[in-house]
């Protein structure tokens, strides 16, 4: 038995979906514990592309139970459309393979409206939110006025919450943002219908996980976004609205922290970032554009082009510290093929000092200059390689340098988008 947390070690989009899909073969349960449909996992299985925003990536495997924990914010319309697409693809979604925490909070139409109205008003100072209502939903959760999944089956409670919340939201939308008000009655009927559709899947995920632990099952916890988008530990304010670090796996699913056995970090072989915020190793040249094109670096949720740059080990080492990582899972190594000279950021120069971990203040980070180590690239196609020793010598040197800088062993090296285009050095289960 092992309970393993998978997190992103950079700014999200590291390729966690493929890794979770790979490890699900030996897991019994796959659990989402934070975030919402602002993140997308892209998987390629048997040449077919699947994009998930809310349903855990393990849904493609028969006999596995996927769970959406209490720490996730759920847009029920998005979830139902995702379930319908899976059904059309021959993967029916039932309580045999998907459970939703009754305590997960629900994204409402006024959350999306507020999200977009605020972002539009900010103009050039906007953060780059996806506009999916994630942040406003978490705000209502903290303000103790949010709608939870179990409320969707209670017409009285749902109606009262919608009407009470719309008093404030409509006032702001009309008077402050100049937007049209939302209709409470129509919203209530829409969400009661969602509740009826989702009711068979709603359960106490915390209790089900405790039963799984007692039975000695393998549980895989699937993080969304990346460490440096964490609301507390990320590059604030250019962050998401939830805790993305491994410590939230327990809180966001209802399992005790002592039940977690291992925490593994996914690291893209280069670095990407979506939206605003500091990015010390960003490339604004042909190499950066090459990474974006070859790596398909466009958001699975928004389609926005991602900013690209060299692998930054200051970013990765900070993630190792924050999450207590015991292994690294390298993705998109094949994207670097054909680049003559590669660079890795080894430290930052901040005035007279050299530092190896990210400074917590945004202003300090923006003032830092990256210090690089240069490596020879490789020309050979590595997509068919399945053993580490069969990789080109320069590829191995790049990975070995990464591992040495991290002080944490490599467990997986992905050499292509497909499930089988992977070198597995160690399984966590």
UniProtKB/Swiss-Prot annotation:
InterPro entries: Adenylosuccin_syn_GTP-bd, Adenylosuccin_syn_Lys_AS, Adenylosuccinate_synth_dom1, Adenylosuccinate_synth_dom2, Adenylosuccinate_synth_dom3, Adenylosuccinate_synthetase, P-loop_NTPase. GTP binds at residues 12-18, 40-42, 306, 332-334, 414-416. The keyword Cytoplasm applies. Keywords: Cytoplasm, GTP-binding, Ligase, Magnesium, Metal-binding, Nucleotide-binding, Purine biosynthesis. IMP binds at residues 13-16, 38-41, 130, 144, 225, 240, 304. Binds 1 Mg(2+) ion per subunit. GO terms for molecular function: adenylosuccinate synthase activity; GTP binding; magnesium ion binding. Homodimer. Its EC number is 6.3.4.4. It holds the Pfam family Adenylsucc_synt. Pathway: Purine metabolism; AMP biosynthesis via de novo pathway; AMP from IMP: step 1/2. PROSITE patterns: ADENYLOSUCCIN_SYN_1 (PS01266), ADENYLOSUCCIN_SYN_2 (PS00513). Mg(2+) binds at residues 13, 40. This is Adenylosuccinate synthetase. NCBIfam families: PRK01117.1, purA. SUPFAM superfamilies: P-loop containing nucleoside triphosphate hydrolases (SSF52540). Belongs to the adenylosuccinate synthetase family. It catalyses: IMP + L-aspartate + GTP = N(6)-(1,2-dicarboxyethyl)-AMP + GDP + phosphate + 2 H(+). Its cofactor is Mg(2+). GO terms for cellular component: cytoplasm. It comes from Syntrophobacter fumaroxidans (strain DSM 10017 / MPOB).
